[in-house]
């Protein structure tokens, strides 16, 4: 029997079992011009390549990209200083400015002073539209319990002006670095709350996702765990991790990505950067705001105490809890 991949809730392909070989073939087809009959058949089966009107920013030689600030103004200040020291020409944020941490309003002036170019994550979409929940994409009751506590706190501590500003942010950006075009999204090009984990994102699927969205690299966040994969086609996928909380590895640093033009027009240099910051000051502020002690423990220990149920088996096996 052919290897099968299950993809649920896919806007393009629907919920079904798809032979792995079909993904490889579709990825190859999406990357080149097709005769009309074959193009029609591929479009019927997989959907047309995405015609994206998003303007392309740049070109840049080097950019810094973060995701999931989660109200961590200490880490954001550290990022802006570190990115400038490393020669980044622009700083991008892939959304989720609030949540988890204290005093989300402290993030806004730092973003503006630092010229950070942000997009909407699920938090921005929900806060700007007055949604009742964060639309995080969790299915487990415990995950949803802590997500609700986090969202309610953030909702109460964001001014109407901040929420309205969130609603003006684009949902995606396209950026040229060297000779490569990058697509910046929150969860995935398909859904703001899709989790792209390293262990459950097969190469053929990523190839097809990049080909259909006509980009050389996809940069995303949402999972809170950083990873980078160079695909056989030369395309790349980078999950930049989270700036707002540790990566569930027992380290108190947080993570962001530096993306630079490499040697040759078609090359990228990607560096996933661990970033120290004053995590003890953040923990003290969280306690002063009476945020859940489980959140504080994560900041101080580097290990997640919540949002564990969403993790795939390999990522969960690396957890302490």
Language-model features: where?
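Active-site environment of divalent metal-dependent phosphoester hydrolases
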Residues: 70-77, 99-102, 123-129, 190, ...
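Active-site neighborhood of phospho(di)ester-bond hydrolases with catalytic His/Asp-centered motifs
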Residues: 66-67, 91-96, 100, 117-122, ...
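Active-site neighborhood of divalent metal-dependent phosphoester bond hydrolases
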Residues: 113-174, 196, 200-217
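Metal-dependent catalytic neighborhoods of phosphoester/phosphodiester hydrolases
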Residues: 75, 97-114, 127-139, 195, ...
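Anionic-ligand binding region
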Residues: 203-231, 235-243
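Glycine-rich phosphate-binding loop signature in dinucleotide/nucleotide-binding domains
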Residues: 58, 83-87, 177, 211-214, ...
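Acidic, His/Gly-rich catalytic cores of divalent-metal-dependent hydrolytic chemistry
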Residues: 9, 13, 19-27, 32-47, ...
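N-terminal active-site segment of His-dependent metallophosphoesterases
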Residues: 7-110, 114
């Amino acid at each position: 029997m052919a290897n099968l991949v299950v993809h649920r809730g896919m806007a393009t392909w629907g919920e079904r079992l798809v032979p792995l070989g079909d993904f490889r073939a579709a990825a190859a087809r999406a990357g080149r011009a097709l005769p009309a009959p074959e193009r029609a058949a591929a479009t019927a089966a997989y959907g047309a390549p995405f015609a994206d009107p998003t303007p392309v920013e740049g070109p840049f030689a080097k950019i810094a990209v973060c995701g999931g600030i989660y109200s961590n103004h200490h880490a954001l200040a550290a990022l802006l200083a570190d990115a400038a020291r490393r020669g980044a020409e622009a700083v991008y944020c892939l959304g989720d400015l609030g949540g988890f941490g204290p005093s989300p309003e402290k993030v806004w002036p730092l973003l503006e002073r630092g010229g950070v170019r942000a997009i909407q994550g699920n938090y921005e979409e929900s806060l700007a539209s007055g949604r009742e929940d964060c639309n995080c994409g969790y299915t487990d009751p415990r995950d949803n319990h802590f997500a609700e506590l986090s969202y309610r706190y953030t909702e109460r501590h964001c001014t109407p002006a901040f929420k309205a500003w969130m609603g003006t942010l684009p949902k995606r950006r396209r950026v040229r670095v060297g000779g490569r075009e990058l697509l910046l999204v929150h969860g995935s090009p398909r859904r703001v709350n899709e989790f792209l984990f390293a262990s459950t994102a097969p190469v053929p699927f990523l190839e097809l996702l990049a080909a259909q969205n006509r980009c050389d690299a996809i940069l995303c966040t949402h999972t809170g765990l950083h990873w980078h994969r160079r695909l056989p086609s030369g395309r790349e996928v980078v999950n930049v991790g989270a700036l707002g909380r540790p990566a569930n590895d027992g380290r108190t640093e947080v993570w962001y990505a530096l993306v630079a033009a490499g040697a040759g027009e078609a090359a990228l240099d990607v560096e996933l950067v661990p970033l120290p910051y004053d995590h003890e000051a953040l923990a003290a502020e969280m306690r002063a705001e009476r945020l859940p002690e489980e959140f504080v423990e994560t900041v101080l220990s580097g290990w997640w105490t919540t949002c564990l149920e969403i993790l795939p088996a390999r990522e969960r096996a690396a957890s302490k809890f």
